[in-house]
Regions:
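N-terminal secretory signal peptides that target proteins for export/translocation
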Residues: 1-7
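Signal peptide processing junction and immediate N-terminal pro/mature segment
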Residues: 24-36
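Hydrophobic ligand-binding cavity/cleft-lining segments
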Residues: 33-123
């Protein structure tokens, strides 16, 4: 989602570079502030990067309605940003699951108490989100092929960071590919996200003059932190597949099929189906959950700090 945790607000990813990716809620320790300058510097808003991203969109394969929406977003882009390329140390099955089922990852954050963000399925490849601080919206995975996903979303923000309600459309082009590594090494993939934000007229000037630096920085941090979390989840599954499978069973906001799919992936990563299916005591499960969440400030502490966009 990401060093967004020195940030008060964040939305998804994988979701989620929509309006919500800027103004949503996760939070991080103070060390992120220094790292932010490096992360921001490695992104790009150049015409060359934008042109390459547009050329990578498979327009001829999209449904007509989606093609028109994509063309409109490209024509009327308020803000384009290629986020810094991230390296995700993650089993490929878990990465694919995370990109296609972001609601499951967000529900893990809820169970671990590290985010107030809610993300609910509206149907196949469609979700609604709310952060509890004024950001709401929907997004849709409109196209996917090996190593490429295209998301389109609508979002709105009504809160203390803006003098009026802000609304707009966001498109995310997500590309990932395996990185060459040593034999037997942890599987790694590069993750590149191009974001196109198209603000409705009332918020256009405010975003371009006031929020643009915050949007760029927040989105970059979000992707960085989400990448770190997915890597940590994959490592937890490698070391303790039964614990991650038990965690999957606690995800009350997603359907049983997704819970079992995540549990199966955890057991596959762990490499021992028999051992991974053994029951765990509550203390062991709680310890794993604590270790997985230890990098991030709790959602309860986040609530006390108020809706400031940055720490």
């Amino acid at each position: 989602m990401l060093c967004f945790l020195f940030f008060r607000r964040f939305s998804l990813l994988c979701a989620t570079g929509f309006l919500g990716i800027v103004l949503s809620n996760w939070t991080h320790d103070a060390t992120a502030a220094d790292a932010s300058k490096t992360i921001l510097a490695s992104g790009s808003s150049s015409r060359t990067a934008k042109r390459e991203a547009v050329e990578a969109i498979p327009l001829h394969r999209l449904m007509i309605a989606h093609r028109e929406a994509v063309n409109e977003c490209v024509r009327s882009t308020t803000l384009y940003r290629r986020l810094p390329v991230q390296t995700v140390a993650c089993h490929p099955d878990l990465l694919e699951f995370s990109l296609h089922h972001p609601d499951s990852i967000v529900d893990i954050w809820r169970v671990l108490n590290i985010s107030k963000l809610s993300l609910d399925s509206l149907g196949p490849d469609q979700w609604s989100f709310a952060d509890g601080y004024g950001t709401v919206g929907t997004f849709h995975l409109i196209y996917q092929e090996k190593g490429l996903l295209l998301f389109l979303g609508r979002g709105a923000y009504n809160g203390s960071l803006a003098p009026k309600v802000l609304s707009g459309t966001c498109m995310l082009l997500v590309r990932h590919q395996p990185l060459q590594g040593e034999v037997g090494a942890v599987h790694k993939e590069s993750l590149q996200i191009d974001t196109f934000l198209n603000m409705d007229g009332a918020g256009l000037e405010f975003v371009t003059r006031t929020l643009q630096p915050l949007i760029m920085l927040s989105a970059s941090h979000n992707v960085h932190e989400i990448s770190l979390f997915i890597s940590a989840l994959s490592e937890a599954a490698r070391k303790n597949p039964a614990g991650v499978a038990a965690l999957a069973n606690q995800l009350d906001r997603v359907n049983a099929v997704e819970r079992e799919q995540l549990a199966h992936i955890a057991r596959t990563i762990g490499g021992d189906e028999r051992q991974a299916r053994l029951s765990l005591d509550e203390v062991t499960v709680n310890r794993m959950n604590f270790e997985l969440a230890s990098r991030w400030i709790s959602a309860d502490e986040l609530e006390k700090q108020g809706p400031s966009p940055m720490r």
